[in-house]
């Protein structure tokens, strides 16, 4: 194996922002934007974009499709293991770098991959029929450091494996990207309108007045009955908590990229993303990190506990204080923290798993959340894929104990979750990884936009309050769709 294999990294100057540049490539196949749209001093420091992958890996059940240019190959096996093997040849050594992602795989793992991590029933309807995972592998990415206000091109030269050829290709790809950036700075006046960021005044001026119907996969009565059924399972000792969700669908009357611009304007989030993949376009504004790996350090940040934002400062303060001091919400958060500690303990060194933040209040444009942070150090020989298999899917969106909670989810939710509550993010050539929990996210397929919202049910839960909480979590998504003042919610 070649040692000391590094990428080429060059700082560049551009007059356009990351969202504006992505607007110029958003309609290209396999274009992506991993967008940190919040305070750059904390979680919103870096954004990444790119297109033209040299390798695409997607899976349906145990059938894995591998695309290299015009060549298509089908393999069979566990998708997690196959993805790990396919990425293994493309490795970079760790080196000092200005950004954490130096090229690699970008894409999604759907919740339905849980059938490869646990033995579970599968009775819910798979009506969206999307691949259960899809990762595109990029040799060149454009990175933004929002704190330092710098931009970088990272070029790796893959899939070339011979070192001289790899570096030659890396230099060529770097120069191509610089030429593209120069061209955009010259012609941005032609391309910029509608490509980048959207302010509140522009958002309001574009507000549509027509009525749009949201269709749920639950009737309100069915959702209430399902909440109470979960409470019965809890009373019987089956579980402590179950995350129950409902999915909405609406006809999409704007482009997916326009929807992304609107969602970014109304709900900037630290773990947002846009994936323009052939079978689905994903627009995410997730506030939650599932797993971050940097060298051997692992971090997960489960979110559990929600209140809507108030209409004024006094109401805002009251709701924030109510959430902070809610025994129910803190108990939910603690249950999930214990679950995540156990999951990390399966692959981390003994004594390294620690809770560094417990149920701290975080403020978002439409809601308050309670968030905790759990960290650990991976055991020698454990890969990021091993970690993913041990912890997937995230405990904050299943319940506890995890396996029984997932069995109940399959029983009570009428349709498969697909990408919802799975993960979006990157797996780097240097084996670093950062992936979110897919919440506050649109799945766009064949002219329809789907989004799913839910909450953690415990014995003390009030069914009607839980139903309302799902609507609170949908506020930013509904506003991004720019629905009419009269929003009609219809049952399935």
Residue ranges and their predicted role:
Residues 1-492:
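Extended alpha-helical targeting/anchoring segments
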């Amino acid at each position: 194996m070649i040692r000391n294999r590094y990428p080429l990294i060059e700082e560049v100057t551009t007059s356009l922002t990351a969202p504006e540049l992505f607007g110029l490539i958003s309609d290209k196949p396999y274009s992506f934007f991993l967008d940190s749209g919040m305070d750059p001093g904390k979680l919103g420091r870096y954004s990444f974009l790119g297109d033209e992958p040299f390798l695409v890996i997607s899976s349906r059940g145990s059938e894995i499709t591998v695309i290299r240019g015009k060549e298509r190959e089908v393999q069979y096996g566990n998708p997690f293991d196959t993805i790990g093997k396919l990425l293994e040849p493309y490795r970079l050594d760790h080196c000092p770098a200005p950004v954490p992602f130096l090229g690699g795989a970008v894409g999604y793992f759907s919740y339905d991959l849980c059938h490869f991590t646990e033995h579970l029933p599968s009775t819910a309807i798979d009506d969206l029929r999307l691949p259960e995972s899809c990762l595109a592998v990029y040799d060149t990415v454009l990175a933004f450091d929002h704190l330092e206000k710098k931009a970088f091109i990272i070029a790796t030269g893959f899939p070339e494996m011979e070192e001289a050829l790899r570096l030659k290709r890396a230099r060529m790809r770097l120069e191509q990207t610089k030429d593209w950036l120069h061209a955009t700075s010259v012609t941005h006046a032609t391309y910029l309108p509608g490509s980048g960021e959207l302010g509140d005044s522009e958002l309001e001026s574009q507000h549509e007045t027509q009525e749009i119907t949201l269709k749920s996969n639950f009737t309100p009565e069915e959702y209430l009955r399902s909440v109470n059924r979960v409470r019965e399972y809890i009373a019987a000792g089956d579980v402590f908590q179950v995350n129950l969700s409902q999915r909405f669908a609406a006809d999409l009357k704007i482009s997916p990229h326009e929807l992304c611009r609107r969602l970014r304007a109304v709900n900037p989030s630290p773990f947002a993303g846009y994936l323009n993949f052939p079978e689905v376009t994903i627009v995410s504004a997730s506030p939650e990190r599932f797993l971050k790996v940097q060298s051997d350090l692992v971090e997960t940040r489960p979110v559990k506990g929600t209140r809507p934002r108030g209409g004024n400062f006094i109401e805002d303060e009251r709701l924030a204080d109510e959430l902070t001091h809610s025994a129910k919400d803190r108990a939910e958060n603690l249950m999930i923290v214990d679950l995540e500690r156990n999951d990390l303990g399966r692959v981390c060194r003994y004594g390294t798993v620690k809770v560094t933040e417990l149920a701290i209040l975080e403020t978002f444009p439409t809601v308050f959340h309670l968030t905790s942070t759990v960290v650990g150090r991976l055991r020698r020989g454990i890969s990021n894929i091993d970690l993913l298999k041990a912890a997937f899917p995230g405990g904050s969106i299943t319940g506890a104990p995890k396996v029984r909670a997932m069995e109940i989810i399959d029983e009570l939710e009428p349709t498969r979750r697909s990408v919802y509550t799975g993960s979006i993010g990157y797996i780097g050539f240097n084996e670093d990884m950062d992936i979110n929990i897919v919440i506050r996210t649109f799945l766009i397929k064949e002219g329809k936009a789907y989004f799913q919202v839910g909450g953690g049910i415990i014995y003390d839960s009030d069914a009607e309050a839980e139903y309302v909480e799902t609507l609170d979590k949908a506020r930013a998504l509904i506003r991004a769709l720019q629905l009419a003042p009269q929003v009609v919610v219809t049952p399935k």
